[in-house]
């Protein structure tokens, strides 16, 4: 089978031969039909990979501290080799996968062979995914639409933390893929929505989905526009889906919010906060974690132990289901978010488009090779140049 891997040393992406994962207890083996390239996360990963070693360090200061500590204990040369080795490890890209269940592991009762499912599997012909990270697709939802379910769940979890009520005014800062999906879900919750972004084409889509818009790139003041949008009382909540190194989105969110307003960070921003902005209004600020409860919990994800329904209503899997239900009901429209479609074998072209077109949103990969071909076992030998002076001699027996 084939899979997309990224070289973290230089940011290059390749479609390469990889071993077919073996289905195991509590897992599904899925034959992929469609996958969505996450414009935000994957563009950030590719950009990080292409950065110099110094720029990589600047982007991850917490890792620099770990490296410096390792230098003190293990020495400079050993640490340098360890860093280079870490960067040389290829990274599997993708987490928005749609496919057909090919095999069901022991202990899985809610899925069967032939089911159409979404999962957070990577960009690959065949993926093995824990059952709690999969959800069945309704018959009237296409594979292309369903591929947006996982990324939409990221926005949905932010909404759940914000707890919007009918008629409230909300701001979505960052009208990228997650932001535009969040806008639609807030509108479905009966909220008035203001979208803030520097990209007018994305704001035009936000307006199409029923939001008011603000473009700071045209000299519009987000705080003033937000206060006017709230009719002078301050907005009830702000969901930040932007990705930026500066703290402006959080600062602006605090200043446009009403007393006891809610601010939810779904994206990535700087966090240099002014205490007075939050103290005087008793604002709530919370960082949202991915798709929802269960994320990064090995008991839930890897071992398949679900949370009690009565205590955790919305797990990450149940968020997947909720998004798919909205699509089935026509409440969530992703068709305008599809920018381009590529054959899986041409994925490198898709990643070129991802880095070249900053306005791009939904890039879809289509998988058309026969399942039998994907399951063929092949051995791929990578050429290695050996210098005689670096030869290693070993003895067996």
Model-based region annotation:
Residues 1-90, 121, 366-378:
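Short N-terminal strand-loop motif that marks the start
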Residues 4, 228, 232, 237, ...:
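C-terminal capping/lid region of NAD(P)-dependent oxidoreductase domains
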Residues 37, 111-112, 164, 257:
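Short, well-ordered loop/turn sites that connect or cap secondary structure elements
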Residues 78-89, 96-120:
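A glycine-/small-residue-rich N-terminal strand-loop-strand element
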Residues 116, 142-220, 224:
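Mid-domain Rossmann-like dinucleotide-binding core that forms the NAD(H)/NADP(H) cofactor-binding site
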Residues 121, 197-198, 289:
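Conserved acidic E/D residue at the C-terminus of a beta-strand in Rossmann-like folds
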Residues 162-164, 204, 209-288:
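Glycine-rich cofactor phosphate-binding loops and adjacent beta1-alpha1 units
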Residues 273-336:
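C-terminal substrate-binding/catalytic core of Rossmann-like NAD(P)-dependent dehydrogenases/reductases
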